[in-house]
Amino acid sequence: MDAVMFGLETPLMAALQHLLDVPDGDAGAGGDNKTGSGGSATRTYVRDARAMAATPADVKELPGAYAFVVDMPGLGTGDIRVQVEDERVLVVSGERRREEREDDAKYLRMERRMGKFMRKFVLPDNADVDKVAAVCRDGVLTVTVEKLPPPEPKKPKTIEVKVA
């Protein structure tokens, strides 16, 4: 999508867009392609970095849980995915696709964000990854991760002293 379309054609925006654009050819100028797929790892990284930067979120610690509140405007429950990776990384992602165009309609301005939404959060050690719940209401996703109960303090072990 072009910055001109949004009225953001400035030298700064052009420079930023140029830095974020990834060519479709080899991954590097020397043709160093470690992925074997034309630099797709680089494109994936840039796409994911853009998605993470554009997805606002709040993290709250509650008495018995952690709450992750993520804006996911225009996404339905079928478009949102919540996963726990590597046993300690909470991944919230989704994708908003362009609506079907009407033949007789012409966009004069498109400001709503299309594309991928994603955030990754490293969970604290006391988070119970088996007790994760997610609710989406009015474009706001709330993921709740319960805390593990605090470990009980160890009681001192009494050793019987025998008289010899």
UniProtKB/Swiss-Prot annotation:
Coiled coil: none
Location relative to the cell: Cytoplasm
The entry's keywords: Cytoplasm, Stress response
Entry annotated with the keyword Cytoplasm: yes
One biological process term in Gene Ontology: response to heat
Top-rank taxon, per record: Eukaryota
Single annotated GO MF: unfolded protein binding
Matches recorded under InterPro entries: A-crystallin/Hsp20_dom (IPR002068), HSP20-like_chaperone (IPR008978), Small_HSP (IPR031107)
One CC-aspect GO term: cytoplasm
Presence of keyword Transcription regulation: no
Main location: cytoplasm
Boundaries of every sHSP domain copy: 48-164
Pfam families linked to this entry: HSP20
Family that this chain belongs to: Belongs to the small heat shock protein (HSP20) family.
Protein name: 17.8 kDa class II heat shock protein
Origin species: Zea mays (Maize)
